[in-house]
């Protein structure tokens, strides 16, 4: 695992508008400050991902998403709390509380509270992060630091070393309103 100093350095890069790569539960991720439109635009350009698709926000704790969850029905809040931290991403109504560069054309946003210690340590310092697989569109998700560096040679502001979490597949994605599975794990 990365040292506390390395995590602090990565957090500083994020807070200064940088784009980083880091290991997650199953694949390497790219991340940046979700409130920094320039950083998000750069991340999307690196991935060759259109903004209309939207992005995932990852956090250390459910409380980091309180500004989105406070007005939701109690049953939905209980469903989220029971599944986090863990490999569960939920599509949650954003109630126009997030910019379009995060949500794309959707009325919901993808949220996950990670159980990966490195992701959690990073989010404790930065707050929620954009989290998307570290790969250009149409290519397999990176499962090693070497692959990240091959995909994005000298294009990232920081690559935070560490091990993947051991899961074979990316997180399950479900719609909070319906319970429907959008992507199985």
Swiss-Prot record:
Listed Gene3D superfamilies: DHBP synthase
Annotated keywords: ATP-binding, Cytoplasm, Nucleotide-binding, Nucleotidyltransferase, Transferase, tRNA processing
SUPFAM superfamilies: YrdC/RibB
GO BP, one annotated term: tRNA threonylcarbamoyladenosine modification
PROSITE patterns, per database record: YRDC
Single GO MF descriptor: ATP binding
One Pfam family this sequence matches: Sua5_yciO_yrdC
EC number in record: 2.7.7.87
GO cellular component: cytoplasm
Domain YrdC-like: from-to ranges: 4-185
Residues in the signal sequence: none
Location in or out of the cell: Cytoplasm
Domain of life: Bacteria
Recorded catalytic activity of this chain's protein: L-threonine + hydrogencarbonate + ATP = L-threonylcarbamoyladenylate + diphosphate + H2O
Function: Required for the formation of a threonylcarbamoyl group on adenosine at position 37 (t(6)A37) in tRNAs that read codons beginning with adenine. Catalyzes the conversion of L-threonine, HCO(3)(-)/CO(2) and ATP to give threonylcarbamoyl-AMP (TC-AMP) as the acyladenylate intermediate, with the release of diphosphate.
Family to which this protein belongs: Belongs to the SUA5 family. TsaC subfamily.
Name of the protein described by the UniProt record: Threonylcarbamoyl-AMP synthase
Species of provenance: Ectopseudomonas mendocina (strain ymp) (Pseudomonas mendocina)
């Amino acid at each position: 695992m990365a040292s506390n100093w390395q995590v602090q350095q990565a957090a500083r890069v994020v807070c200064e508008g940088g784009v980083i790569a880091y290991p997650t539960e199953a694949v390497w991720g790219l991340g940046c400050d979700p409130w920094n439109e320039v950083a998000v635009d750069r991340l999307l350009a690196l991935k060759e991902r259109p903004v209309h698709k939207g992005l995932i926000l990852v956090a250390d704790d459910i409380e980091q998403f309180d500004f989105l969850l406070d007005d939701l029905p109690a049953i939905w809040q209980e469903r989220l709390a029971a599944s986090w931290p863990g490999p569960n991403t939920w599509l949650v109504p954003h109630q126009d509380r997030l910019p379009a560069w995060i949500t794309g054309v959707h009325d919901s946003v993808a949220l996950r509270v990670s159980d990966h210690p490195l992701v959690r340590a990073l989010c404790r310092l930065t707050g929620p992060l954009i989290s998307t697989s570290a790969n250009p569109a149409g290519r397999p998700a990176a499962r090693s630091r070497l692959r990240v560096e091959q995909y994005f040679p000298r294009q990232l502001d920081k690559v935070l070393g560490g091990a993947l979490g051991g899961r074979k597949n990316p997180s399950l994605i479900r719609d909070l309103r319906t319970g429907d599975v959008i992507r199985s794990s």
